[in-house]
Curated annotation (Swiss-Prot):
GO terms for cellular component: HslUV protease complex. This is ATP-dependent Clp protease ATP-binding subunit ClpX. The gene is clpX. Zn(2+) binds at C13, C16, C35, C38. PANTHER family: ATP-DEPENDENT CLP PROTEASE ATP-BINDING SUBUNIT CLPX-LIKE, MITOCHONDRIAL, ATP-DEPENDENT CLP PROTEASE ATP-BINDING SUBUNIT CLPX-LIKE, MITOCHONDRIAL-RELATED. GO terms for molecular function: ATP binding; ATP hydrolysis activity; ATP-dependent protein folding chaperone; protein dimerization activity; unfolded protein binding; zinc ion binding.
Length: 426
């Protein structure tokens, strides 16, 4: 045991050598002692090592081409949107790393600002799924919010802080991890200003929500009620910094294409001007020519648009794309239903004509890829009801007639085993 002094019984820290009089606290172990200063130092070292382990190293951050390739495995089509998202997400997390690791001392300090994303496109074309797949690849907390449920603070509905609460919950209340997550706000076109001119009456679910979202989109220290502000007004708040939270804001923006066409059509006036018909614009990406002035005319306020510098548009899915969605992705619907039938010991097969007929119905209903599952359920419902109760079915074949004419799928009976044939003959 380490002692110090003239015959005294002063104890020393076994690590730094300071006596018990030189420190606030000395903790004894089996034959060793440690002071409070050494404990603090150990804690600091451990925290630094844990922080380094949690941070995604720049070498490990997937490149834009790798992000796009990963998206290709799950999402069919939308190549322009994939490229835009891949670059935006890569630059966003590269910016976070630059802030955490510090900048190269040889370079002049440059502050990298955040670039949130605005996604435009019809319903059922993969906007939400693209964002979900991105979060899955990057292994970051991901939360989805519906803009139509939001209102200004003090009115019936959800506060914008509830969006941040969903992200914190997705991160298992790990605030540090939530601060580098992704928030997807859907139906943002529904909070457009009701008229182009500012109203004297309060628009609490439109322009008011846009105003409330400005700060968290830009980056602020927000106070989030852990159980919802409306029901528990006296609870303690969670502090979260949204500076490094990536916001992907999306909507169908029905009617925006007319605003774009009116503006683009005016350019076709005069000699030598390129004239584009409405049919030509409709067959291409509706929102490829979108400008901030179009979004302002639609009903978004300039400050809101300014915080969404990256614009990615998705297009209507054609028949070929819908057929590919049914069968090609890693978690394609056809593969899912084949697996469900396998669990009952039955093989399931779709003819090529059947897949095309399902795609035709989805286009006719105007539901895009989102409507494919509903059509599959309708087609397979009769056999999914009967199959579990039968043991004489080997295979179910879905044909074009099954989809178009509501004809039952073709059922291929199972051949009886040798023992079953013997029992039957007996």
């Amino acid at each position: 045991m380490a002692r110090i002094g003239d015959g005294g019984d002063l104890l020393k820290c076994s690590f730094c050598g300071k006596s018990q009089k030189q420190v606030k606290k000395l903790i004894a172990g089996p034959g060793v002692y440690i002071c409070d200063e050494c404990i603090d130092l150990c804690n600091e070292i451990i925290e630094e090592e844990l922080a380094d382990a949690d941070d995604v190293k720049l070498d490990e951050l997937p490149k834009p081409a790798e992000i796009r390739e990963f998206l290709e495995g799950y999402v069919i089509g939308q190549d322009t949107a994939k490229r835009t998202l891949a670059v935006a997400v890569y630059n966003h997390y590269k910016r976070i790393q630059a802030g955490e690791k510090g900048r190269d001392s040889r370079c002049e300090p440059v502050e990298l600002t955040k670039s949130n994303i605005l996604m435009l496109g019809p319903t059922g074309c993969g906007k939400t799924y693209l964002a979900q797949t991105l979060a899955k690849m990057l292994n970051v907390p991901f939360a989805i919010a519906d803009a139509t449920a939001l209102t200004e603070a003090g009115y019936v509905g959800e506060d914008v802080e509830n969006i941040l609460l969903k992200l914190i919950q997705a991160a298992d209340y790990d605030v540090k991890r939530a601060e580098t997550g992704i928030i997807y706000i859907d139906e943002v076109d529904k909070i457009a200003r009701k008229s182009e001119n500012p109203s004297i009456t309060r628009d609490v679910s439109g322009e008011g929500v846009q105003q409330a979202l400005l700060k968290i989109l830009e980056g602020t220290q927000a106070s989030v009620p852990p159980q919802g502000a409306r029901k528990h007004p006296h609870q303690e708040f969670i502090q979260i910094d949204t500076t490094n939270v990536l916001f992907i804001v999306a909507g169908a923006f029905a009617g925006l294409e007319k605003i774009i066409y009116e503006r683009v059509g005016k350019r076709g006036l005069g000699f030598g001007a390129e004239v584009r018909s409405k049919a030509e614009i409709d067959t291409t990406d509706h929102f490829a020519d979108v400008m901030p002035e179009d979004l302002i005319k639609f009903g978004l306020i300039p400050e809101f648009i300014g915080r969404l510098p990256v614009v990615a548009s998705v297009t209507n899915l054609d028949k070929e794309s819908l057929v590919k969605i049914l069968s090609e992705p890693k978690n394609a619907l056809v593969k899912q239903y084949i697996r469900l039938f396998e669990m009952d010991g039955v093989e399931l097969e779709f003819t090529d004509d059947a897949l095309e007929a399902i795609a035709d119905q989805a286009i006719h209903r105007g539901t895009g890829a989102r409507g494919l599952r509903a059509i599959m359920e309708e087609v397979l419902l009769p056999v999914m009801y009967d199959i579990p109760s039968r043991d004489d079915v080997a295979k179910v074949v879905v044909t074009k007639e099954t989809v178009q004419d509501n004809v039952l799928p073709t059922i291929v009976p199972r051949k009886p085993s040798r023992s079953e044939r013997r029992d039957k003959s007996a």
